[in-house]
């Protein structure tokens, strides 16, 4: 009887193969995704996936962890070196899990937090309906300057003094420009607040020294996922310097384990470690090319007739390009993103700061990220070609199937994962 279920295995493996073939021939511009190197993929598919470990290396609650411990200790060494921190905890299994640990470790129900609203690019885990709310925090949101596409510093300073929060959170999901950590962290600390920086989207840019340096600008803690501009497997990390009293750090560590996780997905942990080594070796060049590509794509899209956000600020300082398509169709991003998918161009619709929340399914914006296409070797010239593909679909109204054929041929030339020990740098950066 069990033999009859083999077809489900075959179907699943078939769908996986179909997905991999499809993805290799699309232009993936999802800002929260990336591609791992063969070495990292090997680590994630290793026998570490079968192992269980709880607690700190050399202090496990399970036996048989001697090799796992060595890998995790290497990881702590590499992450602290990469980010210039005192501590790095690789155990969180996602960025949201890392945020949970900080909220549960350093705050109490009823404490106040100031975060970025989701309409302004804040992450759902920061909100009353996310991890912050589940902790029972009273959530306030940063005043936002739509023209600057950033936190309003003067109004934020006033809000901090009025609210006297226990924690303030910088960072988010719509993140083209650095946040004013340097300006606002001292004010937060005046009222006794912890300063947390959610670097999920920009962790690789921080590692590559191409974005702001939160720990040097006043943040106590960086939380992040490890699979966006930091091109590792899906997972999380908490990076921090010494802050407060020893007992406060102990509370944070206790919140991670046994608070919000037990075993920490050791195969993914191993992949994070190899990715950290790759970023120490290649991260500065990778991050620099990401920012160059984002700027090039933004400029090219503007030249093709799109309304790209942030023109007076150089469009972007990160991997993200934000486009307002509300003038192209009543459904705006809700129309554009599926149409582009038909053409093999993958990105996501996104609320813009002036959108009401009820427009979540038909928001004004598109969020574009260039980190994955950068990692497969694309540079500024390729960004211009991508902009032309997008114009053909959304402005020229060409048949997406026709554009898809051209996208397939274009993407076929970019199949290696660079900025890695497997393939080194792209050839054009070796010259």
Swiss-Prot record:
Report the residues modified as N6-(pyridoxal phosphate)lysine. 228
The EC designation for this entry is 2.1.2.-
Q: Which domain of life is it from?
A: Archaea
Disulphides: none
Residues annotated as coiled-coil are none
Q: Which UniProt keywords apply?
A: Amino-acid biosynthesis, Cytoplasm, One-carbon metabolism, Pyridoxal phosphate, Transferase
Kindly indicate whether the keyword NADP belongs to this entry. no
* Entry's localization field: Cytoplasm
Q: Which CDD domains match?
A: SHMT (cd00378)
For this chain, one GO molecular function annotation is: glycine hydroxymethyltransferase activity
> Which PROSITE patterns is this protein grouped with?
SHMT (PS00096)
Which pathway does the UniProt entry assign to this protein?
A: Amino-acid biosynthesis; glycine biosynthesis; glycine from L-serine: step 1/1
- Subunit note: Homodimer.
Functional summary from the UniProt entry: Catalyzes the reversible interconversion of serine and glycine with a modified folate serving as the one-carbon carrier. Also exhibits a pteridine-independent aldolase activity toward beta-hydroxyamino acids, producing glycine and aldehydes, via a retro-aldol mechanism.
What PANTHER family does UniProt report for this protein, alphabetically?
SERINE HYDROXYMETHYLTRANSFERASE, SERINE HYDROXYMETHYLTRANSFERASE 1
What name has this protein been given in UniProt?
Serine hydroxymethyltransferase
Q: Which organism is it from?
A: Thermococcus kodakarensis (strain ATCC BAA-918 / JCM 12380 / KOD1)
Report the gene name: glyA
């Amino acid at each position: 009887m069990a033999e009859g279920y083999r077809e489900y295995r075959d179907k699943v493996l078939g769908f996986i193969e179909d997905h991999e073939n499809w993805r290799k021939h699309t232009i993936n511009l999802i800002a929260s995704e990336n591609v791992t190197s063969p070495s990292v993929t090997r680590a994630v598919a290793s026998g570490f996936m079968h192992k269980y470990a709880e607690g700190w290396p050399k202090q496990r609650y399970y036996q048989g962890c001697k090799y796992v411990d060595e890998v995790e200790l290497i990881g702590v060494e590499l992450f602290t070196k990469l980010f210039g921190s005192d501590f790095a905890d690789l155990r969180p299994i996602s960025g949201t899990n890392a945020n949970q640990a900080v909220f549960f470790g350093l705050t109490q129900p009823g404490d106040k937090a100031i975060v970025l609203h989701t309409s302004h690019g804040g992450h759902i885990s920061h909100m009353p309906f996310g991890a912050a709310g589940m902790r029972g925090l009273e959530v306030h949101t940063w005043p936002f300057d739509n023209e600057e596409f950033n936190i309003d510093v003067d109004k934020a300073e006033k809000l901090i003094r009025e609210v006297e929060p226990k924690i303030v959170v910088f960072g988010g999901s719509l993140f083209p420009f650095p946040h004013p950590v340097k300006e606002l962290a001292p004010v937060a600390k005046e009222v006794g607040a912890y300063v947390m920086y959610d670097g999920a989207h920009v962790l690789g840019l921080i590692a590559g020294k191409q974005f702001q340096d939160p720990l040097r600008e006043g943040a106590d803690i960086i939380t992040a996922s490890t699979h966006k501009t930091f091109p590792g497997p899906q997972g999380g990390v908490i990076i921090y310097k010494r802050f407060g009293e020893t007992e406060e750090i102990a509370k944070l560590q206790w919140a991670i384990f046994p608070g919000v996780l037990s075993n920490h997905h050791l195969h993914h942990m191993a992949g994070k470690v190899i990715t950290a080594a790759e970023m120490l070796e290649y991260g500065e060049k990778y991050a620099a090319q990401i920012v160059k590509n984002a700027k090039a794509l933004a400029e090219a899209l503007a030249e093709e007739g799109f309304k790209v956000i942030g023109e007076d600020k150089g469009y972007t300082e990160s991997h993200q390009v934000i486009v307002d398509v509300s003038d192209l169709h009543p459904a705006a991003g809700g129309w554009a993103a599926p149409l582009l998918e038909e053409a093999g161009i993958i990105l996501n619709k996104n609320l813009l700061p002036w959108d009401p929340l009820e427009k979540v399914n038909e928001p004004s914006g598109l969020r574009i990220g260039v980190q994955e296409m950068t990692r497969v070797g694309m540079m500024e010239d390729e960004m211009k070609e991508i902009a032309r593909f997008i114009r053909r679909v959304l402005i020229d109204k060409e048949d997406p199937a026709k554009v898809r054929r051209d996208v397939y041929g274009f993407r076929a030339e970019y199949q290696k994962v660079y900025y890695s020990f497997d393939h080194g740098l792209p050839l054009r950066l070796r010259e």
